[in-house]
Amino acid sequence: MTATMMARVTGLAALLLAFCAPAQETAPDALVKGLVNDVIEVIGQNKDSRALVDLAEKKVIAHFDFKRMTQLALGRSWSQASPPQQQALERAFRTLLVRTYSTALNQTSGRTRVDVKSPNLSPGDTEVMVRTVVNEPGRKPFNIDYRMSKAPGGWKVYDVVVENLSLVTNYRGSFQSEISRSGIDGLIKVIEAKNQKQEG
């Protein structure tokens, strides 16, 4: 799967979680099921780029564990970063994901249908994979799976797996290559430059 396609489907994955009410007792699959119709309606009605960025910033952040995502994407390099570097990395990576998602949403059809599969969840479980099948007109159905963990504020996503390709693993390879070339500060500058380019 190309980077462009990965960005597009993870953009859809992000928006599928954007309208969940922050209810601690809600099962993770119910969070996804409860929002699909509203999300598809918004995609169909609103294609304004700025509005989609605002939507992602206001809604997506609440349902994604960006700190854990950043830790996983950095791998062993996370522990080598200083606290200020860790904060800068998390902030830059969060902005990168939000803007990537909002850009991808512009390409998503309002006729998308998402089938959510109930996970095998036992009492006391704090980690779960919620599997979904996305159907878009003119395309083969594809899988988007959410790795989620239970936090004090409810279930949060810490990885998105598209056709068996992990989002954080996908970023880890490019991040490690950049760190090898220019160090952690160099990686921060590269991510921030991408964010500025997307904003402009």
Cite the ranges covered by each PLM segment:
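Surface-exposed, polar/charged faces of alpha-helical domains
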Residues: 41, 45-51, 80-84, 111, ...
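N-terminal signal peptide c-region/cleavage motif recognized by signal peptidases
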Residues: 18-20
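Low-complexity, intrinsically disordered terminal/linker segments enriched in charged
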Residues: 159-200
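Surface-exposed, charged secondary-structure patches
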Residues: 91, 99-142, 194-200
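Solvent-exposed loop/turn segments at secondary-structure junctions
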Residues: 78, 95-96, 121-122, 136, ...
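Bacterial N-terminal signal peptides that target proteins for export
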Residues: 1-11
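Short beta-strand edge/turn micro-motifs at domain boundaries
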Residues: 141-169
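Early exported N-terminus immediately downstream of N-terminal targeting peptides
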Residues: 25-105
